[in-house]
């Protein structure tokens, strides 16, 4: 009963916001590169958002075909959109997104880099295909929200990294023990500007409260 109430309350809050926004279509496009060693092409990632009544429909038509090792499956693309949807429209429900999802449709184009078909490689999906799918989701939702003066204060730009530049290295330390490390510079990057003010220089990734680095200057 408690879980159902959380979902129902979240749904009603979402529907109230939808009632304040106009129907329409919003699009955003970005690019990613390096699907494999030696690849110098750019690969397009496109997202279209339709609002029809209380329903939101997301499409990735126009995204580049799956290639190399940077692909993600449908679940990765869907999850990336849910992150932005949660942060921009469900934050007041303590990020309980289940109620809102009753009115969200995901319409993928199979065989694309963020909705890849088997047997595509997905070894770098979290830092490439999923990360690069997240930012257009922020942008199309922000364009939609901008039309309402009261909700406009929730708009924010993407973070300071267009994708996650993962530099991973491993080896043996001076005691002969194995080690591995991932450069975490994007965690200490900037949060983009808000509709009501500047961003945060060392804000990190705003979508998670644990993704932060200390400011050594203070």
Outline where the language-model segments fall.
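Glycine/proline-enriched, intrinsically flexible loops and inter-domain linkers
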Residues: 1-218
């Amino acid at each position: 009963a408690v879980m159902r109430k959380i979902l129902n309350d979240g749904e009603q809050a979402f529907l109230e916001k939808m009632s304040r926004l106009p129907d329409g279509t919003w699009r955003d496009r970005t690019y990613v590169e390096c699907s494999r060693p030696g690849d110098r092409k750019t690969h397009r990632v496109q997202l279209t958002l339709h609002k029809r009544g209380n329903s939101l429909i997301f499409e990735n038509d126009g995204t580049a075909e799956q290639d190399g090792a940077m692909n993600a499956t449908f679940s990765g693309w869907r999850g990336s959109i849910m992150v932005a949807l949660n942060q921009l429209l469900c934050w007041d429900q303590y990020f309980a997104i289940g109620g809102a999802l009753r009115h969200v449709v995901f319409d993928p184009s199979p065989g694309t880099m963020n909705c890849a078909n088997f047997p595509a490689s997905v070894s770098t999906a979290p830092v490439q295909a999923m990360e690069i799918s997240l930012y257009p989701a922020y942008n199309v939702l922000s364009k939609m929200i901008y039309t309402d003066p009261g909700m406009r204060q929730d708009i924010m730009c993407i973070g300071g990294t267009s994708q996650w530049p993962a530099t991973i290295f491993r080896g043996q330390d001076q005691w002969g023990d194995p080690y591995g490390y991932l450069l975490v510079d994007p965690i200490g990057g900037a949060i983009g500007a808000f509709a009501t003010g500047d961003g945060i220089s060392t804000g990190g990734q705003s979508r998670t409260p644990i993704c932060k680095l200390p400011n050594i200057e203070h």
